[in-house]
Amino acid sequence: MSIDIRWLTYDDRNFALSLLNSTFSAANERFEDFQNTFPRIFSANAEKNISQHVGAFENGKLIGISAAYILNYHIGNDTLRICANGNIAVSRSARGKGVMSAMFEKIANDTSDKCDISYLHGKKARYRLFGYEECGAQYNISFTRHMLKDTAFVQYTFSDMRSNSYEQYTDELMAIYESKFDYIERAKDELVPALTSCGRIPICIFDEQRKICGYISYDSQNESIEEFGFKNYLDADKILKSFMNLIQTDISVRVCEYDKALLDYLIDISESYTVSAPALFKINNFENVIRICLKNKTEQIKNLPCGSLCIKSDMLKSPFKIEKNKDTVSVEFKPDTEKCDIELNGYELHRFLFGIHRQKYIGDERDLWFPLPLYIPY
């Protein structure tokens, strides 16, 4: 019997939850409840989010599932169109039948022209087979009570939005969220459920005058803040000190480099930091991704050298040329006859453009363009 691949509907919700819960419970050796862990996606009224999953069916039975959420990621005045893959599961009896390959083919065929980039979290060796490579950079910044001991103490109030009513504050929370330099476009009613994903605690922050001054999404198991927004990022030292005083432990914060002023400030008040790849990426639209990322770097780092660079790769339909002037960046594909400055094969292209530990490939000032910032806050 052939395997049927199609997008799910709300009628498939219970079957999807059953497959995900059983597959991940067995893999993680603990009970997993996707409805509670991912309320934005699997709550009883989240019909549109169920429909952003591809399912594999054999004899009418769901045997495989993979998410493909189409999202807009705003970075300054630019927008990256992204496809968030995840919730990938294949029933044990169906493994080895090409189910995962068929689902990824369906996702690629239906989303590649709609999205600049796709990403997921998982084992590099497994997902490289489908065009995903580990790259990009996230800063895991560690804060300690000792490091902030000289910071003035302010008594902030931290309210768990799972157990306290927050609807009256939704507009203020959204205003803080959308004032950030980079953020995923979300509907108002999706913000708090999104901050609750993966079992995290969505916390609303009030200052001493009981006015909202920010929010955090806190992972209590790993003692880390996975997402945050403050009205004034220069209050971060006081907010973090107050929060660590409340929970009586040191914490880490995950940050990107799109907003360099924020990143530099957090590093300056931190104990230490490490840099790692945030995800595995499959780039569908090299022109737009490179243009947005290099434009961002140009805006964040003054006096980045100007010039042009033509790159050839077996992963590209033809060579592409990057041109950077003082305030503008352009990226376009060129004919194969174009003389290229550098040729990169396979995933070396990703490491060249977005690799953390990147060697100097070019040997002149254009090396300062790279690595380009690439990050996903999800």
Positions of predicted regions on the chain:
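Conserved GNAT acetyl-CoA-binding A-motif
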Residues: 104, 110-122, 247-258
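Short hydrophobic/aromatic beta-strand element in the GNAT-like acyltransferase core
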Residues: 51-55, 65, 87, 200-204, ...
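Short amphipathic alpha-helix that is part of the acyltransferase structural core
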Residues: 1-70, 77-80, 84, 148-188, ...
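Glycine-rich, histidine-containing beta strand-loop boundary motifs that form or position
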Residues: 121-124, 130
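Conserved acetyl-CoA-binding loop-helix of GNAT-fold acetyltransferases
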Residues: 87-90, 96-109, 233-245
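A glycine-centered beta-loop-beta connector
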Residues: 57-61, 206-211, 365
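Active-site/acyl-donor-binding loops of N-acyltransferases
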Residues: 125, 133-150, 241-378
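Amide-forming acyltransferase catalytic core, primarily the GNAT-like/NAT-type
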Residues: 138-246, 256-258, 288-305
